Amino acid sequence: MIIASLFEERAQGLYHNTTAVIDADGAYLGKYRKNHIPDDPGFYEKFYFTPGDTGYRMFETQYARIGTLICWDQWYPEAARITALMGADILFFPTAIGWDTAETSEAANREQYEAWQTIQRSHAIANGVHVVSVNRTGIEAGTRFWGGSFVANPFGTVLYQAPHNTPVTQVVEIDLRLNRKYREVWPFLRDRRIDTYHPVTNRWIDKT
């Protein structure tokens, strides 16, 4: 199975940050277009990319039901929750994120990386799924990409973490039976009060 990240030229001047999913037998299963487009120092993607319009996607592969979310999507619990509710057993996050080499310290770098890993491990716990986050390494245009790709189980336990500075290829075995186990122990999906969540669709909740 391949999750291929690409810059999709949909039309002249219309570009998406996209992943294509190809199954183990070579069958093309579909694509997901990145929904959340950042515009912050070092990551001015709104200049290049249009927000996705595929909605969130779940793909039935020969090995598991998977969801793909791209980079900045990983900071939004709503994206992970919706993809999990669609039936995904594993959430994949292809990523290119790092530090400004001129402005950060080792302490700040460590704090940012830990925040990045923590938010994704929380998606694993809250949704009872495995998370696979794959980040690039190296330096480009003043950004040192922090690597540190990792795999977490539904309890948020890190099963593997890659080095920060060296690209690696790693096979990690996961047990999808743990999804059911942890969802039965911590039945967060069962206990959701979906009738109370409408306010989350507001940009901000103003005082009345």
Spans of model-derived segments:
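Cysteine/selenocysteine-centered motifs that mediate thiol-based redox chemistry or coordinate metal-sulfur cofactors
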Residues: T54-D89, F93-T95, N179-T208
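Short beta-strand scaffold segments in enzyme catalytic cores
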Residues: A4-L6, T18-V21, R57, S149-V151, ...
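Short, glycine-anchored, charge-dense loop/turn motifs used at functional sites
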Residues: V21-L29, A152-L159
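A short, polar/charged loop-to-alpha-helix boundary motif
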Residues: K34-Y48, T166-E184
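Residue-level detector of high-confidence beta-strand sites
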Residues: T18, K31-R33, Q161-P163, V171
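CN hydrolase (nitrilase-like) catalytic-core segments centered on the catalytic cysteine
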Residues: M1-I3, R65, C71-T169
